[in-house]
């Protein structure tokens, strides 16, 4: 990112320059060539130190058509991630498969000395996430999870405000988001491919926004709820290129709404809710309450990776309760959040830096999602137990 400063009172947002490459070119492969891979390809194509040399997809001809559509030549194509990794000398891979197939290719890549940029959600279950983390630790390679909101300057401002101490001790957080109608198609809505629904697709973003801001405290207990009232109803479903509304309603086997009450280490309460569909425009703004001040962050429909509008800081000035508006900050260039997500991963590979979005943090995110699912199924609060890595 280009250098620059945005100032709000005592808070200054700084943008660091991208790390300069030393002339080394990275050989990159793509695993899974569905729609999310499009954002990866568009990002890689803007970089002059990357060669896209291989692509793997289970569907015959899909990877070839994908690369042709994006004008990428000289690519070797494979029917599986194993064949691609075994036959190519890759520096890194983007894993863009459907959710239930995140863990297996990630582990295989790490075990074979390849750095990994893995699309969110991390995995479907906590057990899978733990297995991936152990493979990462053993490999010594970089594994970064694809949370592009991390590079948004407004998200960074939230963290900066919390870390400044302006809010005091954080004791309560409300977060979430969603859409009145916004159920996705294809592999998202079936348990065999999506694994989890709105909870994993967009809920992981809402969790990361606040957990990253407060330093990712360990989750202790969770009481969760999830439902599928809209996804299984033809009246609130929608067709796609391959299925009618009735067919999509029959196929739907994940959650379209989830809510939870989570206790975090440090005596912090997290009140969470997320939806692909609901009969209201928002489940509520994100609220971070501290002993000195509070911060309100307008909710979004979880499409664009930033905040929903001007934030408000509630604090006392000379003993007088005061509301201070925090204007939306403009990101420093027009390359987009996805580009900077990919670039930060490659910079880590080139310069031997830590993963931009480390699994040590997202493991806690996944533990909460896993706990919500398990609690919803059994109908009562559960302890969250995270195995040693």
Residue map of PLM features:
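Predominantly a Rossmann-like dinucleotide-binding segment in NAD(P)-dependent oxidoreductases
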Residues: 149-251, 379
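Glycine- and charged-residue-rich phosphate/anionic-cofactor binding loop of Rossmann-like
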Residues: 51-54, 326-330, 347-365
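N-terminal Rossmann-like dinucleotide-binding module
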Residues: 2-72
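Contiguous beta-strand/loop segments that form the cofactor/metal-binding neighborhood of enzyme cores
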Residues: 2-22, 208-306, 339-353, 370-371, ...
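C-terminal capping/lid region of NAD(P)-dependent oxidoreductase domains
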Residues: 141, 168-172, 374-389
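Beta-strand-loop-alpha-helix segment that lines the small-molecule cofactor/substrate pocket
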Residues: 2, 85-87, 92, 98-151, ...
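Hydrophobic residues in well-ordered beta-strands that form the structural core
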Residues: 79, 118, 143-145, 174, ...
